[in-house]
Each structure stands twice: as structure tokens, then as C-alpha cells.
Amino acid sequence: MAANRDYYDVLGVSRDASDAEISKAYRKLAKKYHPDLNHEAGAEEKYKEVNEAYEVLHDPQKRQQYDQFGQAGMNGQGGFGGQYGGQGFGGADFGDFGDIFSSFFGGARQQVDPTAPQRGADLDYTMTIDFMDAIKGKTSEISYSRSTTCEVCKGSGAEKGTHPITCDKCGGSGMMTITQRSVLGMIQRQTTCDKCAGSGVIIQHPCHNCHGKGVKTQKQTLQVKVPAGIDNGQQIRLAGQGEAGKNGGPYGDLYIVFRVRPSKDFTRRGQTIYTTVPISFAQATLGDEINVKTVYGDTKLKIPAGTQPNQKFTLKEKGVPSLRGGSTGDQVTTVEIVIPKSINEAQRKALLEFVKASGGSIAPQEKGFFERLKEKLS
């Protein structure tokens, strides 16, 4: 760095700046000018200046000497430039650059005791059921695979009569702290212990039943009670039916997601059931009582005289029961008036009499009566 360049100017801070202000300024400039991040001409030299200035100003003793004597008080120990100048950047390891910045700028991983009890993972299971089973509920048997605690070693992974020992390389933490030299100086970062694979323990005599894993994969069979009123895409939770925990931790849960097959007779929206029934022109005109399908069986529906096309009728409490209990939805039935495609002579004469009695007439050149009736009813 040029001999007349002031370290405070390099970092852009005042001479009475606090340690926190100096560190903040350095972090900002180090990221800005780092050669791996900035390929502009002069960035590498600027980066060296920033590190040299920080090497002095963040050290209370060096800073005091600098404030009193200037660069002459450094005796060639001005930090980064003298320490790494001969090496340059070729010897720096940038393979773990993300880890370096994470550790350097406060992103260190939180330590977790690997030998502490850990809850098992949750599992998902998709269960396909019929439309009517979703309405009324049922009990079904399912089978799936999950890990269970080894019954021989009770989850320790060690042969009966032996115990796991604390890893002598990481001291049981499951992590190793590595100190390495980088372009940012000497830094520390954590990595998984390569001896115990992060478990914190060594199993000298693995269990013959689970081969040291502490768990075994087994087929699980359950009787699942499908709640009445369950809908497509909804799920239920079965506590403790998931994967085995570690170090004595509890089992995870099993989540069952329901897929409901569609019905040819009914559709559903929430707690309401929808259906359509056909009736004749005579039934719509004169009125009638008809049988209507519901999810609970056939029921009677009174069709009043003068019923119009697509008129809706509500059948109370013939819908879907609430999952919470206490209420049942309705069924909405839409009537569809069916016009016959052909009629016999007696029917034709009867309809003509009906038209005359109604004060109308049908001219031969006009559209057919049933065609006009269809248009009117559509």
C-alpha cells in the first residue's frame, strides 16, 4: 500500500471510530473488493489495502502504535500485506468460500448435542376411498413400511451387554472445528466429524440384529378409522405411527391424506350433496311424488304442480355430516324435465286438445309443438 495512504481513509471511518464501526466497514469493503467477487482492474490491490488497514486498526495495540507513530510505528508488521504478500492468492483455498464467509460474518452453525433424544420423522400415506365411505365413514386396514426401534439393542446400535463410547476425535459433539488460513486471515469453521459421522459416539460392537443402526425397517399394519364426512384432500394424523426416534426420542407421526373417488349419482361441495332427477312434462305440470336417491337411501320428494325446468328442492339433513359432529348438511336436488323424442297418435291428439284448451293453435307450417316446447323450457 502506498506509504502516504491513511488506514482510516482506506476503511472510510473517522479516527475515533469504535471497534464495531471498523469491523462493519471492513466487512463491507472485503466483500466488495474480494477477487472472487470483483474482477475489475485494481480490485485485488484495493482488497489488499483493506485487509492491511483492518489488520492494524482492529488490534488495540497496533492501533495505538499507528495513532502515535503512523506507519513508522508498524516496523513492517502492517498486517496483511507483509504476511501474505509473498504468497499472493494462489495458495488460498476458495473451495469452501461459502463456508468461510458464513463463519467470518456471523453465520456459524448452532451446536446441537448429537446424543440428545431426537424425534422421529413424520410419514405420509395416501388412502383412496369410495364416495359413500367418505360420507358415512368406515374402518380400513393399511400397510406401510417404517423404521422401528431395534428390540435387541433398544436403539443404541450396540450389541447386548456393550455400550457406545464417546468419539475421541470430536469429544462427542459430532462436529470438528477446523482452523485454516484464507485470504481473510485465520478463520475457523465447523464440519461433521469424519470418524463418528456426526453421531458423537463410536460403536465398537455393532448389534447383530440392526447392524449398528439402532432401527430396523418393518412392515406396519394398522386399522384406520375413516371419519364420516372426510373430504377429498383432507388428512388425519395418527400420533406415534411415523419413523422411530433416535437416542430414545419419540416416534414421528403418520399423516393419512384421503383421495375420494367420484360418484356417478352425487356431487359434493362442503357439507352439501347435489343430484339431478328427471321428470316428465306431465309430472311437472300436474305435480307428483317421486323417489329420489340420497346417500342414506331413497326418499320421497313431492313435485308441486307447475314445477319449472331446473327447479331446485332441498332435502334437509340428507347431506354430509360435520367432522366435528352435531350437524348434517342438506341435499339439493334439481329436476330436469324430459321431453319425449317421439309420441304415438293418441298422445299427439291429447296434446293438441291441451293446446286448444289453452287457447293456442299449432299451424302445420310452424315448428313442431315439441320443438317449440323444448325452446320454451330451455
From Swiss-Prot:
Keyword Ubl conjugation: no
Family: Belongs to the DnaJ family.
PANTHER family (UniProt xref): CHAPERONE PROTEIN DNAJ, DNAJ HOMOLOG 1, MITOCHONDRIAL-RELATED
Keywords: Chaperone, Cytoplasm, DNA replication, Metal-binding, Repeat, Stress response, Zinc, Zinc-finger
SUPFAM superfamilies on file: Chaperone J-domain, DnaJ/Hsp40 cysteine-rich domain, HSP40/DnaJ peptide-binding domain
Binding site for Zn(2+) 1: C150, C153, C207, C210
Assembly, per entry: Homodimer.
Compartment(s) where it occurs, according to its Swiss-Prot or TrEMBL record: Cytoplasm
Cofactor(s) this protein requires: Zn(2+)
Protein name (Swiss-Prot/TrEMBL): Chaperone protein DnaJ
Keyword hit for Zinc-finger: yes
Primary location class: cytoplasm
Zn finger residue spans: CR-type: 137-219
CXXCXGXG motif repeats: 150-157, 167-174, 193-200, 207-214
Description of its domains: The J domain is necessary and sufficient to stimulate DnaK ATPase activity. Zinc center 1 plays an important role in the autonomous, DnaK-independent chaperone activity of DnaJ. Zinc center 2 is essential for interaction with DnaK and for DnaJ activity.
Gene Ontology molecular function: any one: zinc ion binding
Residues involved in Zn(2+) 2 binding: C167, C170, C193, C196
Its job: Participates actively in the response to hyperosmotic and heat shock by preventing the aggregation of stress-denatured proteins and by disaggregating proteins, also in an autonomous, DnaK-independent fashion. Unfolded proteins bind initially to DnaJ; upon interaction with the DnaJ-bound protein, DnaK hydrolyzes its bound ATP, resulting in the formation of a stable complex. GrpE releases ADP from DnaK; ATP binding to DnaK triggers the release of the substrate protein, thus completing the reaction cycle.
An annotated GO cellular component: cytoplasm
Organism domain of life: Bacteria
Transmembrane segments: none
Note on cofactor: Binds 2 Zn(2+) ions per monomer.
Listed GO biological process terms: chaperone cofactor-dependent protein refolding; DNA replication; protein refolding; response to heat
Species this chain originates from: Lactobacillus delbrueckii subsp. bulgaricus (strain ATCC BAA-365 / Lb-18)
Domain J span(s) in chain numbering: 6-70
